[in-house]
From Swiss-Prot:
Keywords: Aminoacyl-tRNA synthetase, ATP-binding, Cytoplasm, Ligase, Nucleotide-binding, Protein biosynthesis
Annotated binding of ATP, by residue: K249
Record motif 'KMSKS' region, residues: 246-250
Pfam families: Anticodon_2, tRNA-synt_1c
Assembly, per entry: Monomer.
Protein's organism: Leptothrix cholodnii (strain ATCC 51168 / LMG 8142 / SP-6) (Leptothrix discophora (strain SP-6))
Any one GO BP annotation for this protein: glutamyl-tRNA aminoacylation
Source taxon at top rank: Bacteria
First-level EC class: ligase
Main location per the UniProt record: cytoplasm
Name of the molecule in the record: Glutamate--tRNA ligase
One Gene Ontology CC term in the entry: cytosol
Listed transmembrane segments: none
Length: 468
């Protein structure tokens, strides 16, 4: 079990530059679950410094996706663009301490340096031309050039941290060049802003994708330059798509909210995503409450998780079986609304859900089944020819007459009518039940025919049986 000595504070810090997919949202789920499991605080931070690509629409999609999945944040959303004055204040502190310095090297010079290094089979990196050192003569400052500010990365030694997923990581400082932390216009860069945010928001645990591992040693140096110890890091392996590629919009990933439209339950998606990189023994199906009870960082997986839609559909089907029928009724009504069909969310719809949900893996499939109750049906010619034969028509007429005479439309009365008809015509149950299903529901296979008929309005059943 993960031991924590101070109140846990985690964060999800997406960039609003496009829709959010399952691979992204897992980086929200785990810090949310860890905060909830430890009684901590979950912070939402929007890293919107890429002004050209960021949009309010993308922010709205992030918030909507998190809201649907129930990943509620305790603080935020905080926007980096609204914190620029704070970043510049902290940057001035580093300047005053001599921990950053101006660099006037042009992009042309940097490109030429990089080409020389690559030609010599060296790692491309800034060579410290403008880094002040005792006794070093710096180049003449070019006229009319605004410098970037670079951070003085410690020389010699290494950066070490105990990653909660990857274990002990050590990176030599000689591998790191002097990071640009402010652009020529004075705007702070990503790695600097992140550290200031994490300090100001008192983040104790950073749980994020392993594409950030290379940023971590740089951020640790900035933390320590500001007199702070870094948080605990947990770098999550990549989520792969079904083709084994990194999940991304380019490779066909869907927006999180599309899963809602396709009939997946939020709790099922949370369950599936949690298992895509974390485990609690052999438990495959669990509730949100169980996830919170069980979640810790010690059982995060070290290998990439691969998305499998068939498995997600199976998980969803299990959650549908467990789902409250009244809740399902509301979700099915939303599916009907997308088809421009207004269906009341009432006890009758809940009973329909109870009867048919075990046959379905999504609420879209459940709405497909239940549409027989609300719109005209059309049985296939094949089913009509196979089951509604001349031999059974007299029995169908007898059953219709008995059903028409019922004063009480309930399962027991309908069942009695069916049994009496079978006895009168010396039939076996399937020889009557299947043609009734075909005529009334449009399908040859359904749950128990008396239970199915009970949920119809009596006059609709009589009208559909009249077609014989």
């Amino acid at each position: 079990m993960t031991q924590v000595s101070t109140p846990v504070r985690t964060r999800f810090a997406p960039s609003p530059t496009g829709f959010i997919h399952l691979g992204n949202i897992r980086s929200a789920l785990y810090p949310w679950a860890f905060a909830r499991a430890t009684g901590g605080t979950f912070v939402l931070r929007i890293e919107d410094t890429d002004v050209e690509r960021s949009s309010q629409a993308a922010v709205d999609v992030i918030v909507e996706g998190m809201k649907w999945l129930g990943l509620d944040h305790d603080e935020g959303p905080f926007f980096q663009m609204q914190r620029m004055a704070r970043y510049k204040e902290v940057l001035a502190q580093l300047v005053a301490r001599g921990q950053v310095y101006p660099c006037y090297m042009s992009m042309t010079e940097l490109d030429a340096l990089r080409e020389r290094q690559m030609a010599n089979k060296e790692k491309p990196r800034y060579d410290g031309t403008w880094r002040p050192e005792p006794g070093k003569v710096l180049p003449a400052v070019p006229e009319g050039v605004q410098p970037v500010l670079r951070f003085r990365t410690p020389q010699g030694g290494s950066v070490i941290w105990d990653d909660k997923v990857k274990g002990r990581i050590e990176i030599s400082n000689d591998e790191l060049d002097d990071l640009v932390i402010a652009r020529p216009d004075g705007t702070p860069t990503y790695n600097f802003c992140v550290v200031v945010d994490d300090i100001d928001m008192a983040i104790t645990h950073v749980i994020r994708g392993d594409d950030h591992v290379n940023n971590t040693p740089r951020q640790i140096h900035i933390f320590r330059a500001l007199g702070q110890e870094p948080p605990v890091y947990a770098h999550l392996p990549t989520v792969l798509n079904e083709q084994g590629e990194k999940m991304s919009k380019r490779h066909g990933a869907k927006p999180v909210t599309q899963y809602r439209e396709e009939g997946f339950l939020a709790d099922a998606v949370v369950n599936y995503l949690a298992r895509l990189g974390w485990s609690h023994g052999d438990d495959e199906i669990f509730s949100r409450a169980q996830l919170i009870e069980w979640f810790n960082l010690d059982h995060l997986g070290k290998s990439a998780g691969q998305y499998d839609e068939a498995k997600l559909r199976w998980v969803n089907s299990q959650h549908m079986k467990l789902c409250d029928n009244g809740v399902l009724a509301g979700l099915v009504a939303e599916q009907f609304a997308r088809r421009e069909l207004l269906v009341p969310v009432d006890e009758r719809l809940a009973r329909m859900c109870a009867l048919f949900k075990d046959r379905c893996s999504t609420t879209v499939e459940l709405a497909d089944w239940l549409s027989m109750y609300f719109v005209p049906i059309q049985a296939s010619e094949q089913d009509l020819a196979a089951h509604v034969t001349d031999a059974v028509r007299p029995a169908l007429q007898t059953l219709r007459d008995k059903l028409a005479a019922l004063a009480s439309w309930d399962k027991a009365s309908i069942s009695l009518c069916i049994k009496e008809t079978i006895a009168t015509h010396a039939l076996k149950m399937p020889l009557l039940a299947v043609p009734v299903r075909v005529l009334v529901t449009g399908r040859a296979q359904t749950p128990s025919v008396d239970a199915v008929l009970e949920l119809f309005q009596q006059e609709i059943v009589l009208k559909r049986l009249q077609s014989v």
